[in-house]
Amino acid sequence: EQIEPAIAQVVDKTTLVSFHAGANDVLRPGYRPENVFPIYNDAVRKLSATGATLMLFTVLEQTGNTGKTADMWAERFGAFNKNVRAIAVEVGAIIVDANEKQFLSDRRLLAFDRLHLNSLGHDRVAQGVLEVLDMPFDPNWRLPLPAAKPTPWLVKKATSVAWFITFALPWIWRRIRGKSSGDGRSAKYPNPTSWPLS
């Protein structure tokens, strides 16, 4: 839905198109890379064919968790990233690799849902993007966060329970019903918006 409006904005190679998609599909129980990768690659080729400068993103493979589930996610996201890197080479896209800086797996950069970046995480990634684009950036983005203070056991457990009730249970319920978290949602900015806002 977003590709055609984006293509309509392309002037030439001075237009930067950033594209990040497919990572949520990796989380689904019925995930099939043989279905997801061709759709992702077709979208990338379509955007690249416009002549715009194209930027792609990988996702974290290691999040600091351990165990069989963490290993499964690492394997899935590793294969996903391999595809992203391969198509980036094919079309000559810029790539922002989330796995180049180990500190990006620091959980303090994540929102409460443990899936998306919080404001600090977004700022770090934004500075990394500016560096990749050879634009002015804050070099401190590369510095790991200070050592975290130990979290009391009870606080950890309470936080995990709150997360499970708020995010995990609704996710499981949606999967059972064959629903997606995106069903019924519309884009925050469905139409092209000038930036900076005046």
What residues fall within each predicted segment?
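Conserved catalytic region of serine esterases and O-acyltransferases that act on ester linkages
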Residues: 90, 113-116, 120-198
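Active-site segments of SGNH/GDSL-like serine hydrolases
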Residues: 20-24, 45-78, 99-105
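Charged helix-capping and loop-helix junction motifs
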Residues: 33-41, 76-81
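A structural motif corresponding to the C-terminal end of an alpha-helix
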Residues: 43-55, 83-96, 132
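Oxyanion-hole/transition-state-stabilizing segment in secreted/luminal serine hydrolases
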Residues: 1-37, 61-62, 168
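Short, hinge-like loop/turn segments at secondary-structure boundaries
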Residues: 3-7, 62, 72-75, 113-115
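Substrate-gating cap/lid alpha-helix
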Residues: 64-98, 119-123
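Short glycine-enriched, charge-decorated loop/helix-capping segments at active-site entrances
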Residues: 31-34, 69-74, 111-112
